[in-house]
């Protein structure tokens, strides 16, 4: 799986949430949209935790860039309810609300 969040605490929280499941392996952590696009193309992850708001290119824009090539299961991470609801327009499997 790939975890993308521009905040170190956000990435750490996701890792901690999933730490007990040996079936899940984090292959890369990203902080920007372009890093995420490269990681998806390099690793073809089955699962992607993706922050909606990233500096520069948004998480949604990054996902749109690779959508025709690779379709990981996506769980959007956001601090805003409106973004969470919009995530389902992009076929998100689920979302996590940041505190």
Question: Which positions does each model-derived feature cover?
Answer:
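CheY-like receiver
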Residues: 38-99
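Conserved acidic segment of CheY-like receiver
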Residues: 1-9, 14, 18
């Amino acid at each position: 799986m790939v975890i993308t969040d521009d905040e170190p605490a956000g990435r750490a929280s996701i890792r901690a949430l999933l730490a007990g499941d040996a079936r899940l392996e984090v292959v890369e952590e990203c902080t920007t949209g372009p890093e995420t696009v490269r990681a998806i193309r390099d690793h073809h992850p089955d699962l992607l935790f993706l922050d909606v708001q990233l500096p520069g290119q948004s998480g949604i824009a990054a996902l749109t860039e690779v959508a025709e090539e690779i379709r990981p299961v996506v769980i959007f991470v956001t601090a805003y309810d409106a973004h969470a609801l919009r995530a389902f327009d992009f076929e998100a499997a689920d979302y996590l609300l940041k505190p």
